[in-house]
Design a protein with these regions (language model features):
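Residue-level signature for tetratricopeptide repeat
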Residues: 15, 50, 57-58
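Terminal, low-structured helical/coil segments at or just beyond the last alpha-helical repeat
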Residues: 95-120
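Inward-facing hydrophobic residues that define packing positions of alpha-helical scaffold repeats
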Residues: 17, 22, 29-30, 71-72, ...
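TPR/TPR-like (Sel1-like) alpha-helical repeat modules
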Residues: 62-82
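Boundary/linker segments of alpha-helical solenoid repeat arrays
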Residues: 38-42, 78-92
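Hydrophobic/aromatic side-chain positions at a characteristic register within alpha-helices
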Residues: 5, 17-18, 59
């Protein structure tokens, strides 16, 4: 988890994501992502969440090709993150992305939720 993360804004992005407002979640995370060192772990963390949100946005708009490309990017980025699975459910998100890549039909009955527990 980035040390300088604005936890209030991150929580708002999570709320957008979990409410199915994937475009809004992506926009919010992207604002922070742009300021991260390219290819740093923080960069990969935010890129993974952004790509996951955009993949689900593409799915909602019947863009199968875009969904598949962004799911792959999301998984690649999330797999580059070694943060402990303490504040965000990274292992569950990675697992869901793997399953959705193998069988896109799961998106019809199971969408991921980001579980975020801010630090004390």
């Amino acid at each position: 988890m980035p040390d300088d993360l604005d936890h209030r804004l991150f929580a708002e992005s999570v709320e957008h994501f979990n409410a199915g407002r994937y475009f809004e979640a992506h926009e919010s995370w992207e604002d922070d992502w742009r300021h991260r060192a390219h290819r740093s772990e923080d960069w990969h963390f935010l890129k993974g969440l952004i790509c996951l949100a955009v993949a689900l946005h593409h799915h909602a708009n019947a863009n199968e090709r875009g969904r598949g490309m962004l799911l792959r990017r999301a998984l690649d980025s999330l797999e580059a993150v070694t943060y402990p699975d303490t504040w965000v459910n990274l292992d569950e998100l990675r697992d869901w992305a793997r399953r959705a890549l193998a069988d896109p039909q799961i998106i019809e009955h199971e969408v991921p939720r980001v579980v975020y527990v801010p630090p004390p």
